[in-house]
Amino acid sequence: ENEDTDLLLPALLEGQNYGAAAADGTQGPSVSVSRNNPAKRNYLVVAVLCFGNLINFIDWFIVPGILLDLQKYFGLSDGKTGLLQTVFTLCYMLAAPIFGYLGDRYNRKIILGAGIFFWSGVTLGSSFITQSHYRIFVLSRGLVGIGSASYSTIAPTIIADLFEEGKRTTVLSIFYIFIPVGSGCGYMLAAGMAKSTGDWHWALRVTPCMGALALLLLILLVPHRIQRRTAAHRARSISGMIRRADEKPDVHTAAKTTWCQDVGSLVKNCSFVCSSLGQTAMAFVTGALGVWMPLFLYRAQVVQGIVPPCLQESCNSSNSLIFGGITVGTGILGIIAGAEAARRLRKKNNKADPLICATSMFISSLCLYIALMVAQTNILSTFIFIAFGELFLSVNWAVVTDILLYVVTPRRQSTAIALQILVSHLLGDAGSPYLIGVISNAVQARNSPSLQWSFRSMQYSFVICAFVGVFGGGFFLLTSFYIEEDRKEAQR
């Protein structure tokens, strides 16, 4: 009962502190204050957020699922093809700090709803773009990226406000499972719709319907105001090793600071900086794999004589389906394994989280390198090593976010997530698909046109991903040197 009383005052004051009150002055329900089984309502909110995250990443990876069809339809080189995902990611990362600023100060439910409505509408509109309007198609992908940024920046902070200690790790793991699940479903949905209809445009007409459902669920099931926890409740170890704070939430700790002050504080946080650079390496590798791997596998099969070259618009989509299935399966297993490993090892080592991330990055890089080397001779071995590479990459998703949530004070967490998105995409997957395509073009230009060099150009381009993954592991190792001190600072 004391906890209910402690949480009541910040919930009532949230509208004053962050501008969360509705314009007409109506009072929305508060999750933490609800006496009708608040735990059940919290899980309903998480279910809605997970569904939205699923749609978010399906939209993200629909285009890579039909990449070969798009190349034939618009007549694109590898470089121009990679530009599609680069534009999406650039707009995504540039919008993220804006939504981080808004999410720390204004009503998060309204921002989420506007983002879902915007990206779903643009996706539907892009499905009607004709062959002569490639630039409009590129622009539409950028606009979808802006809408997606609102969701990825704000949704994790809502989950962090609803749960604490061990539960937060579990719930965040469930939320982040929908990154690989959504990504894999994006490949499979795109390939399946293109194959069944004979027209890739239909692949872009499914998720807007799902987005409309997500928006309806958001309106009906997510409270208008969700109480923001203070540092005493949130900025502590997820493992529960640090004892529950005795002081009551102090509304004065939520005093406003400028965005520049928030950024200045975050830049001095070594754990945040190093883990963000580690995640940047993750983003570089996953971005390149996500866009180019189905096409790389197709070219490997062509060189081996397993499939014929695609000379028409509706191309073989089996690699997108298989790679999508691998992404879903390894993503679920990896995130669950990462969360469980973190939960167990934190009891023995306070530096367990960054060490888990570093180890998984090193192993993933090795598996990816082996997959590239055997691709020309054994396609089955290639699939196996790609699966292991993706499995160990997926281990990090929830763990990296967990690190951020306990080394950054709560009132700066939306900004921290936004900055992490900005850095990881600016130096990671914003450029990696385009870079891989440009290197592939350069290799092909220096050799005579052939199916063999079409494959080798992509193979040589991908090698850079293995080395970037090793650098990512190094940054996570650096994080382990600072994480204990920064965690204590966040608690204070």
Describe the residue ranges of each PLM region:
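Extracytoplasmic gate region of multi-pass secondary transporters
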Residues: V63-P64, N269-I336, L393-W397, T401, ...
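Cytosolic juxtamembrane N-terminal segment immediately preceding the first transmembrane helix
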Residues: E1-I58
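Residue-level signature of mid-helix packing/kink "hotspots" within the transmembrane helices
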Residues: F61, T89-P97, A149, S183-G184, ...
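Cytoplasmic helix-loop-helix junction between adjacent transmembrane helices
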Residues: S140-P180
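Helix-loop-helix hairpin linking two adjacent transmembrane segments in secondary transporters
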Residues: F175-Q227
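Structural signature of the two symmetry-related core transmembrane helices
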Residues: I110-G125, D353-Y369
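Conserved MFS/SLC helix-loop-helix module at the cytosolic interface between two early adjacent transmembrane helices
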Residues: L94-Y134
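Symmetry-related core transmembrane helices of the 12-TM Major Facilitator Superfamily/SLC fold
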Residues: W202-L220, Q459-L478
